[in-house]
Curated annotation (Swiss-Prot):
UniProt similarity note: Belongs to the RuBisCO activase family.
Biological function: Activation of RuBisCO (ribulose-1,5-bisphosphate carboxylase/oxygenase; EC 4.1.1.39) involves the ATP-dependent carboxylation of the epsilon-amino group of lysine leading to a carbamate structure.
Subunit details: Monomer.
Cellular component, GO, one term: chloroplast stroma
Protein name, UniProt field: Ribulose bisphosphate carboxylase/oxygenase activase, chloroplastic
UniProt keyword annotation of Kinase present: no
InterPro entries: ATPase_AAA_core, P-loop_NTPase, RCA-like, RuBisCO_activase_AAA_helical
Originating organism: Chlamydomonas reinhardtii (Chlamydomonas smithii)
Subcellular location(s) per record: Plastid, Chloroplast stroma
Residues that bind ATP: 138-145
Keyword Chloroplast found: yes
Chief location: plastid
Length: 408
């Protein structure tokens, strides 16, 4: 006959044998069992003295590995969030490129160069010194950064991103330390089994010398020296004041710029930096423009004519041209709404202002394209800064600075 005890009072007081059984079970639960090798290795990567992580980004690694009682909650009120600098790091440093939609053109030569560079840096090639840095340089507005973003997304890489503005600081040595920190953050991601890369935008603008008008600071010198040191020792990158003989995964570095001749010459030598001049061909320009006008029902033949009409313009010229076409519609909306009421419609309205698609035929695009070219020529011709009080010419060929299609 089996007796079921429903309460602890019955099991602990009324039945003596049950109390003894309960105590024996509790003693069995409190016995210390020697951990197996599998259990010891389970925590090996985050043990003190073994974990080489620079920050507290990874405090969530113990999630679902320990008892729920000792797990902090996630979310705004939780305590199991990476708090040190991880929110800024996730939102500013690491780019996911989830906002890039399919349909954009990637130059085959550009993708080939980036893919080979990243693959070579992750390979163990015998007795071959692979340059750690890939320097992509070329004219302004040619889509270097966007092509890099498309290539990264194609490769499934979420890189650690830095900009030229982070290469200068009021404190000496801060930018060099930041480069090392970001490099080690990317190395930590690779250590966990995911590809990563360090991506530096406009390196020449932050670390180069732009003539005699700019001052060469200690930080400029330290940035160049730090990149040289990392390129020579990519698996031994230490933070200032920390000297541990440890080996970290190698992180390929990709940087963009307009003129690498402004950089420190030993940095851009062939053993440290592989240089790639990005000059899009006619097919590249047509392919990129097809992505720009993909939602406007512009035919390929019209895009080819548009590119041939403005052969000397950069690729971002055509993006600005597409935005310029909406000027007439926005001007008409402002007229209908009233200048004094547009704030209520644009900021405080419950529904956003929706504009219908503008018909973009070749004639309209060429018309607005010529107006953009005229503005460029005005800047070159007037040069107001050189002769500000010397009777500079008015903008426009006819002496009018009024926008096109404006009527008094």
């Amino acid at each position: 006959m089996q007796v079921t005890m429903k309460s602890s009072a019955v099991s602990g007081q009324r039945v003596g044998g049950a109390r003894v059984a309960t105590r024996s079970v509790r003693r069995a639960q409190l016995q210390v069992v020697a951990p197996s090798r599998k259990q010891m290795g389970r925590w090996r990567s985050i043990d003190a003295g073994v974990d080489a992580s620079d920050d507290q980004q990874d405090i969530t690694r113990g999630r679902e590995m320990v008892d729920d009682l000792f797990q902090g909650g996630f979310g705004a009120g939780g305590t199991h969030n990476a708090v040190l600098s991880s929110q800024e790091y996730l939102s500013q440093s690491r780019a996911s490129f989830n906002n890039i939609e399919d349909g954009f053109y990637i130059s085959p030569a550009f993708l080939d160069k980036m893919t080979i560079h990243i693959a070579k840096n992750f390979m163990d090639l015998p007795k071959i010194k692979v340059p750690l840095i890939l320097g992509i340089w070329g004219g302004k507005g040619q889509g270097k950064t966007f092509q890099c973003a498309l290539a990264y997304k194609k490769l499934g890489i979420a890189p650690i991103v830095m900009s030229a503005g982070e290469l200068e600081s009021g404190n000496a040595g801060e930018p060099a330390k930041l480069i090392r920190t970001r490099y080690r953050e990317a190395s930590d991601i690779i250590k966990k089994g995911r590809m990563c890369s360090l991506f530096i935008n406009d390196l020449d603008a932050g670390a180069g010398r732009m003539g005699d008008t700019t001052q060469y600071t200690v930080n400029n010198q330290m940035v160049n020296a730090t990149l040289m040191n990392i390129a020579d020792n990519p698996t031994n990158v230490q933070l200032p004041g920390v000297y541990k003989n440890e080996e970290i995964p190698r992180v390929p570095i990709v940087c963009t710029g307009n003129d690498f001749s402004t950089l420190y010459a030993p940095l851009i030598r062939d053993g440290r930096m592989e240089k790639y001049y990005w000059n899009p061909t006619r097919e590249d320009r047509i392919g990129v423009c097809m992505g720009i006008f993909q939602e406007d029902n512009v035919q390929r033949r019209e895009v080819e004519n548009l590119v041939d009409t403005f052969p000397g313009q950069s690729i971002d010229f055509f993006g600005a041209l597409r935005a310029r076409v909406y000027d007439d519609m926005v001007r008409q909306w402002i007229t209908d709404t009233g200048v004094d009421k547009i704030g209520q419609q644009l900021v405080n309205a419950r529904q956003k202002v929706a504009m219908p698609k503008v018909s973009m035929d070749l004639n309209v695009l060429i018309k607005y394209g010529k107006s953009l070219v005229d503005e460029q020529e005005n800047v070159k011709r007037v040069q107001l800064a050189d002769a500000y009080l010397s009777g500079a010419e008015l903008a426009g060929h006819g002496g009018s600075s009024l926008p096109e299609a404006y009527s008094r």
